[in-house]
Amino acid sequence: MQTNSPIAGCDQSSLAIRGGKPVRETWLPYGHQVIEDDDIAAVTAALTSDFLTQGPRIQEFENAVADHVGVKYAVAIANGTAALHAAYEAAGISTGDEIITSPITFAATSNASLYLGAKPLYADVAPDTGLISAASVEKLLKENRAKGNKKIKAVVAVDYAGQPADYDTLQTLADQYEVSLIIDAAHSLGARYKERAGGFAGIMSTMSFHPVKTITTGEGGIILTNDEKLYDRLLAFRSHGIEKRKERLQKHDGPWYHEMQTLGFNYRMCDIQAALGTSQ
């Protein structure tokens, strides 16, 4: 068998992994953030402000991302995994349900469904892009429908290596089979899909701001949506299920009164992270 491998025919005992001399003296990271003076100034301003968390910089960052992508609502959150967890919960995914997603992704895309007692099913990917194959998704949906299986609640498409998935075709399939479309857009901030920003599609999309992503907040993520009901549910899930807005309280008992109306998590992003994200 012929091969074009650069190590074919060489003495593999000379490879560093087998005791040979390394070609580098220092570790080569798989990604690295870019931090400039304005980023440092933004973080310093946040550190010396009145709010380190739950302050105005959260909304500022959310608005900036929502405006860039072209959606109504954004919910900044602790990390990309938390973003997926929150999105799945808001979509009503729960015990016994199933999602269809891509095997070419970070584990969190699947794990977030397992957190809720659901099960991931895997569609194939296109060999030229690594993106989830709409034809494979359709095959899974059709096969499960023929079996009378109504457990599939969502298709979770993964934007991969800066490439948005085939949003239009996947949305058509989601509508046809009455499932939700959610976009894991961790790789597509700044990308374009038919003249629109990556991550605009589906009932929700999620992003990550880990240092290997397009912009970073250290750790951090965001959920984007045009649905006000989903937005409200995401806000509650992010912060212990707490409701502070006067018009949504069951009763009102002074300026510091709040209600824990549902079960939620502490998945909040802090103002220091948000300041860095807005600067980036």
Predicted regions and their residues:
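N-terminal "arm"/small-domain region of PLP-dependent enzymes with the aminotransferase-like
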Residues: 1-52, 56, 259-261
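Active-site phosphate-binding strand-loop segment of PLP-dependent enzymes
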Residues: 128-217, 222-230
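Hydrophobic/aromatic ligand-binding patch that stacks against planar heteroaromatic rings
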Residues: 111-113, 173, 272
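Structural detector of well-ordered beta-strand residues that form the stable sheet scaffold
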Residues: 75, 100, 121, 180-182, ...
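Conserved coil-to-alpha-helix start sites within the AMP-binding
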Residues: 105-110
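Structured binding elements
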Residues: 117
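Phosphate-binding glycine-rich loop
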Residues: 51-98, 112-114, 122-124, 146-147, ...
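Active-site region of PLP-dependent enzymes
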Residues: 188-194, 201-280
